[in-house]
Swiss-Prot record:
NCBIfam families: clpX (TIGR00382), PRK05342.1 (NF003745). It comes from Lactobacillus helveticus (strain DPC 4571). Zn(2+) binds at C13, C16, C35, C38. This is ATP-dependent Clp protease ATP-binding subunit ClpX. Keywords: ATP-binding, Chaperone, Metal-binding, Nucleotide-binding, Zinc. Residues 1-54 form the ClpX-type ZB domain. The keyword 4Fe-4S does not apply. Belongs to the ClpX chaperone family. ATP-dependent specificity component of the Clp protease. It directs the protease to specific substrates. Can perform chaperone functions in the absence of ClpP. One of its GO terms (cellular component) is HslUV protease complex. GO terms for molecular function: ATP binding; ATP hydrolysis activity; ATP-dependent protein folding chaperone; protein dimerization activity; unfolded protein binding; zinc ion binding. It comes from the Bacteria. Component of the ClpX-ClpP complex. Forms a hexameric ring that, in the presence of ATP, binds to fourteen ClpP subunits assembled into a disk-like structure with a central cavity, resembling the structure of eukaryotic proteasomes.
Length: 424
């Protein structure tokens, strides 16, 4: 114990050489001694090294412009949303890297809400972010969630999905990203107080509050409620980034109604009618989300809100052709593995985009349309080795016509015909 030594020998610190009389405390070990001053110095050295490691981690984290540049390679349009997400995730992981050694200022989590129509890219943006940052990612559907004790899925099961996707690496899971889709579907059924329990609406919002803010959650490793005796896994959600998304059908009118009230009066010009389909998003406030049915406590834990626009026909054509993993590139690659050159005419691409818009599916509907259009070709080509090329036209998409098939023998006969004509 400190300061309890015999007078048989002079006690000195094994590190700095100072005697017991020169320091406040001397701690004895197995044949060695260390003074309080060396303990303080050692702690400072360790803290400095941890700080250096954390700074290095922060430096390796892609900057917002770099994150957006990578998003641009996969996601068409939605520039405003991509900027907001890039800044939010950068600040989130920068906050984590600073927490270990600097607690002078508490930085709050940057949970994000994405509001946009079906097929505008909400889920895909979240997935791409996780891939860029190389962190575990999980998707949950808010419509399957219910308050604890009722039939349905507990909110803790969302964390189990993340843990599973992290291969049960708890540390990695605790720095992952969770995307909760269809969040608008758990809005309150009514603004009025009801005597009946809203277990899939307000009740779920209440259940999500703690994990959104940061808590130690008990997660059943086998999921669900079928194994009540199973030992729980403790997951700290403090550093998990939550992104929620939904279409919020009807919120546009809530915004316009609020703006309209401000212009009512004699001689007042009502500019609400001048707001186009997407411009209303600039006027969206948290109060509008509360009016929609999200409880204030829930919105308070999601400080960053961004909106996504409807994708135009031109945008969807770009989605089909430009990204690294564009659908047209994927199908061309698939058929090329069977020695077939797949081509889409400009008219076909435009027809695919228009059909996705007509069906109100956005980018989400593109794959289904292509798949249905070339299903027979994908069925035949592995067996019919003489197929050299396939051309998909507008009629194939709209009228379900057969794609134009070019066979190797047809090409040879065409070549012979040209040679014969030249001989004559």
């Amino acid at each position: 114990m400190a300061n309890q030594f015999t007078d048989q020998e002079e006690i000195k610190c094994s590190f700095c050489g100072k005697t017991q009389d020169q320091v406040k405390k001397m701690i004895a070990g197995n044949g060695v001694y260390i003074c309080n001053e060396c303990v303080d110095l050692s702690k400072k050295i360790i803290d400095d090294e941890l700080r250096a490691d954390s700074v290095k981690t922060a430096i390796e984290l892609p900057k917002p412009m770099e994150i957006k540049k990578q998003l641009d390679q996969y996601v068409i349009g939605q520039n405003r949303a991509k900027k907001v997400l890039s800044v939010a995730v950068y600040n989130h992981y920068k906050r984590i890297s600073q927490m270990d050694f600097d607690s002078s200022t508490e930085l709050q989590k940057s949970n994000i809400a994405m509001i946009g129509p079906t097929g505008s890219g909400k889920t895909y943006l979240a997935q791409t972010l996780a891939r860029i940052l190389n962190v575990p990612f999980a998707i949950a559907d808010a419509t399957t969630l219910t308050e604890a004790g009722y039939v349905g899925e507990d909110v803790e099961n969302i964390l189990l999905k993340l843990l599973q996707n992290a291969d049960y690496d708890l540390e990695r899971a605790q720095r992952g990203i969770i995307y909760i889709d269809e969040i608008d579907k758990i809005s309150k059924k009514s603004e009025n107080v009801s005597i009946t329990r809203d277990v899939s609406g307000e009740g779920v919002q209440q259940s999500l509050l703690k994990i959104l803010e940061g808590t130690i959650a008990s997660v059943p490793p086998q999921g669900g409620r079928k194994h009540p005796q199973q030992e729980m896994i403790k997951i700290d959600t403090t550093n998990i980034l939550f992104i929620v998304g939904g279409a919020f059908d009807g919120i546009e009118q809530i915004v316009k109604n609020r703006l309209g009230k401000k212009t009512i009066g004699f001689g007042a010009e009502n500019d609400v009618d001048k707001i186009d389909a997407d411009d209303w998003t600039r006027h969206l406030t948290t109060a509008d989300l509360v009016k929609f049915g999200m409880i204030p406590e829930f919105i308070g834990r999601i400080p960053i809100i961004t909106t996504l626009d409807n994708l135009s026909s031109e945008d969807l054509v770009r989605v089909l052709t430009e990204p690294k993993n564009a659908l047209v590139k994927q199908y061309k690659k698939l058929l090329s593995l069977d020695g077939v050159d797949l081509k889409f005419t400009d008219g076909a691409l435009k027809a695919i985009a228009d059909l996705a818009i007509q069906r109100n599916m956005g980018a989400r509907g593109l794959r289904t349309i292509i798949e249905n259009s070339i299903m027979d070709i994908m069925y035949k080509t592995p067996s019919e080795k003489d197929i050299e090329a396939v051309e998909v036209t507008k009629d194939v998409i709209i009228r379900h016509a057969e794609p134009k098939v070019i066979r190797k023998k047809d090409k040879k006969e065409s070549s012979k015909a040209r040679v014969g004509a030249n001989d004559n």
